[in-house]
């Protein structure tokens, strides 16, 4: 069969490799000038680094397995990382039993409830019941009103704004579980990265695809999927139709109704009902580390970011210090209309709050990326809201990061969904 894949992110590349291993003919069409999607790298002041941060957890079996398949297991590195929380003007350690005991913003009963909640989340295997519950209600039931207000309310409000009350508990629970299980021992968090960054994996996938006869077409957006008799006929690129038997879309599903005008109205409506939160992600290169933490949650009403990620505290190759600062917000929020420089300036204005020693001459370089479909809004009942990957048009399949639900966004989930798409296509 001739198969066209739309999108050369990890999901599309893994799907292509699976199909090529089964002897199919595969072409991948990518709008960008490089492979990788959100995991693609850029030249940041002489340092090749990813547009958006990624990390690996101990439970990420799919990516760990893929690294083994590609002969890259020795490129996986594990780091003892630290987590922090900035609350009411003070930086606290977080993520260990000792840190919880020392945290003075909640009482002893709240601390016990918090610990029990994490232990409970670590043991959950079936998320179907929590798919019907809101995350806020779930947290308040386990932690109490005060601990929710101190530790979670600000994070929800600054990532989802008016949508913060309509998130599935399953969506949140898998995130808690993934981090809680990624430990060297009870007292030490351990997270992973790939030597050379995600580019190491992406280039290995590219090589494996091309060796098997697959073709990757960059700067080649698919303009339309042609359909005849309710069956895929071809993909139109630069005005030319390329005949194919299957089309697999791995770009945000919101693009699919435009690419495939023949989709039934009801199915297109289900796609359009899936909502996303964009991100404006500031990246800073500093002379020295801002904090000792990889991940810092910010639960402070005077700082309008939910947290920062000091990637260089995970991956020392990304030195001297690399900080990602994500601003999540709906496109309708007035702040989203600001230019990138305004977000960079706002970020820099907060740094001395997080570290009083910070000085302007620490800044070596700044950058800012935007992505419209950064975080899917997953309300209760999201399992039932997601349209099936196999569309009503024969030979047309689709998935994007919303299909990771209830799992966290990660390259590992891209691997899982990419392989699932390949199996569906061949069924």
Residue ranges of model-derived segments:
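Mid-domain catalytic core of redox enzymes
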Residues: 22, 221-337, 341-342, 346-358, ...
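Glycine-rich FAD pyrophosphate-binding loop
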Residues: 20-44
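A conserved FAD-binding loop/helix module that cradles the flavin
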Residues: 400-425
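Active-site/ligand-binding neighborhood in enzyme catalytic cores
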Residues: 115-225, 250
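N-terminal Rossmann-like FAD-binding beta1-loop-alpha1 element of flavoenzymes
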Residues: 2-28
């Amino acid at each position: 069969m001739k198969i066209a894949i739309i999108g050369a992110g990890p999901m599309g590349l893994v799907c292509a490799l699976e199909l090529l291993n089964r002897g199919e003919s595969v072409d991948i069409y990518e709008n960008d000038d490089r492979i990788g999607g959100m995991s693609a790298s850029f030249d940041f002041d002489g340092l090749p680094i990813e547009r958006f941060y990624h990390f690996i957890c101990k439970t990420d079996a799919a990516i760990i397995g893929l690294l083994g398949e590609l002969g890259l297991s020795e490129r996986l590195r594990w780091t003892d990382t630290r987590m922090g929380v900035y609350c009411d003007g003070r930086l606290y350690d977080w993520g260990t039993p000792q840190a919880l005991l020392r945290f003075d913003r909640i009482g002893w009963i709240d601390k016990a409830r918090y610990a029990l909640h994490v232990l409970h989340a670590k043991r959950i295997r079936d998320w179907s019941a929590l798919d019907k519950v809101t995350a806020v209600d779930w947290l308040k039931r386990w932690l109490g009103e005060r601990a929710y207000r101190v530790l979670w309310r600000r994070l929800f409000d600054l990532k989802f704004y008016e949508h913060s009350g309509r998130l599935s508990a399953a969506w949140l629970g898998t995130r808690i579980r993934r981090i809680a299980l990624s430990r060297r021992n009870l007292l030490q968090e351990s997270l992973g990265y790939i030597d050379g960054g995600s580019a190491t994996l992406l280039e290995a996938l590219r090589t494996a695809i091309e060796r098997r006869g697959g073709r990757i077409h960059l700067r080649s957006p698919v303009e339309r999927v042609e359909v005849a008799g309710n069956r895929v006929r071809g993909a139109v690129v630069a005005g030319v139709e390329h005949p194919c038997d299957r089309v697999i879309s791995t770009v945000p599903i919101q693009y699919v109704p435009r690419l495939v005008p023949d989709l039934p109205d009801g199915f297109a409506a289900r796609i359009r009902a899936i909502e996303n939160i964009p991100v404006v992600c500031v990246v800073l290169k500093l002379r020295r580390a801002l904090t000792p933490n990889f991940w810092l949650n910010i639960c402070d009403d005077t700082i309008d970011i939910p947290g920062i990620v000091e990637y260089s505290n995970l991956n020392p190759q990304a030195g001297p210090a690399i900080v990602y600062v994500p601003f999540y917000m709906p496109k309708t929020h007035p702040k989203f209309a600001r230019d990138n420089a305004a977000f960079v300036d706002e970020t820099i204005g907060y740094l001395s709050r997080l570290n009083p020693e910070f000085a302007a001459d620490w800044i070596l370089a700044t950058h800012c990326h935007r992505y419209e479909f950064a975080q899917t809004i997953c309300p209760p009942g999201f399992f039932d809201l997601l349209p099936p990957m196999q569309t009503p048009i024969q030979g047309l399949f689709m998935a994007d990061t919303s299909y990771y639900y209830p799992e966290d966004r990660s390259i590992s989930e891209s691997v899982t969904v990419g392989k699932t798409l390949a199996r569906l296509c061949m069924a």
